[in-house]
Amino acid sequence: MNFTQQLNSIGTFQGNVLLSGINSTNLNVYNGTTPGKTILWVIYNDTESSNSYPVWSGVIWNREYDSENQTLSITAQEMLSLYQRRRISDTKTYTAQDPTYVAQNLMQYTEAKSYGKTGLTYSVPSSSFSTTKTYNNYEFKSVYQAVKDLAQNFFDFAIIPYLSGGDLVNQFTIGLPLGTPYSSSDPTSAVFQFPGNVISYRFPEDGISAANRLYGLGYGANSKKLTTTAVDSAKYTDGFPLLEDAVNYIDIGDQTLLNNTTLGHLNAVSYPPTTVEIVIPTYVDPYYYTHYSIGDTVQVRINDDYFPSGLNLILRIVGMSVNPGENGPDRVTLTLTRELASGSVV
């Protein structure tokens, strides 16, 4: 079994059930795993506190039974995947509205449709931004894609399972951003060390995707096209050559929004993008689920042949893959990225 989570995206569950030796009638295996109809929950028993928590929920979309091996294979995707199958079928117009309000309203809109209610709850803060959007009824845009497009410029989002009075509930959650910042003065902030509580790690860096001067292209054509330029001049001081690139945001017609969006992109790529993967057990400090989650920033320390003088970075958790051990200990693979740079619009 394996299940994943990704920041502002959709994680996946894959698992196999051996039907040999179990009472499949009493367990209602066939009717209880119907694709497109059934929600699958993953419950984690925390060995530190002996409490149980829902750590993953999603829709079963595929199943396959192999009679030779008597094995049922199940594939599910996080609850956000359901909203890929929900369409904006009425024209919706938002003028100078908080983008977090727009996102929540779109979710509530589709939940209010006939047979659309899933019992979703909401944790949606206000932001300091505003946006103007029109979703035309003839486009039939998916609700998920509309929310994801909003998030690219303004916020993080997820559907998070939790317990409420003993009931399993899903909550649509927006963060500005999601996650808890690392603090050296907070003893609960997660620290990962190799050697130490990290079993292994991968450290790829992609210079081909780096840019320290980025041109943003917005709405319009020819001389009337909106443009902006974002620069991280600190990289030149650090010895990097000029690395230029351009990005297209043809649906952005506001100069301030184009400036902010281009700058955000630059800050993510001005240092060669680094996607670190670390493999850790669930049973050592920091403990799985209770001590770190998607969106958190954590400290990573490495001292080995590749970093003989030691490396100490603050990285953000953007992905998580959990492999519960069947014949060995549980393992968690965290995907982490560098903190954003501090460029400027010129």
Q: What residue spans do the PLM features occupy?
A:
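Amphipathic, non-transmembrane alpha-helical segments in extracytoplasmic/periplasmic proteins
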Residues: 6, 13-15, 76, 91-121, ...
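Oligomerization/assembly interface segments of phage tail-like spikes and tubes
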Residues: 5-24, 71-82, 216, 270-284, ...
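Short, conserved beta-turn/loop elements at beta-strand boundaries and strand-helix junctions
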Residues: 63-68, 320-327
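Short beta-strand-centered interaction patches in the first periplasmic/extracellular domains
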Residues: 55, 59-83, 120-210
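Acidic, small/polar-enriched beta strand-loop surface segments
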Residues: 145-148, 178-325, 341-345
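Surface-exposed cap/loop segments at beta↔alpha junctions
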Residues: 24-123, 339, 343
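Solvent-exposed coil/turn segments that connect beta secondary-structure elements
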Residues: 20, 63-65, 77-81, 177, ...
